Amino acid sequence: MAFKNPETIGLHGGEYRSDPTTTSVAVPIYQTTSYQFKNADTAANLFGLKEFGNIYTRIMNPTCDVLEKRVAALEGGLAAVAVGSGQAASAFCVQNVCQAGDNIVSSTDLYGGTVNLFKNTLSMQGIEVRFADPKDPKNFEKLTDEKTRAYYGESCPNPYLRVFPIKEVADIGKKHGIPLIIDNTAAPVICKPLEHGAAVVMHSLTKYILSLIHI
């Protein structure tokens, strides 16, 4: 069943209805690190990615699986991956499309921690970040070359809250085969970046979604 109301998605999204053992409707917190395999063939298939299932908590955890599916449902996406922090999510998005020698074009309106990540950490990995003023979406195109692998922006930037022109920048990206990554931390309910052309959406979940309650 596909829910439409964001409150309902938050409570019941992600294909979870009840715990198969206790029938509890609350999602259990699985604290285990390891899982028992039915037999050697099952283990081989799981590690060979021929079957979907739990291997090791650092890779897959049933509690995280529900979280990932609910966030994906909230955004109208296909799937999601939960990582340790919002900054890890930003880095993960960029590092999955870039290698040393590549570049991305980012909005100048960014959370300070992301600016630090882009200017310092990624540069040490050989990834160049070019900054474009989003007031004119064409600025992204001006900084694009054959090594540009992604565009990056925040839907409602912290702290400026100047709304990012998602559709306009996404359209430019599609013309050049470049995906747009949107940090939707500030507006996960009122803004749906995927509907406006973004390819990837990320969140720092401890902010709007969890109201500063840590997972």
Predicted regions mapped to residue ranges:
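Short, small-residue-enriched loops and turns at beta-alpha junctions
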Residues: Y111-G112, P137, C156-L161, A187-I190, ...
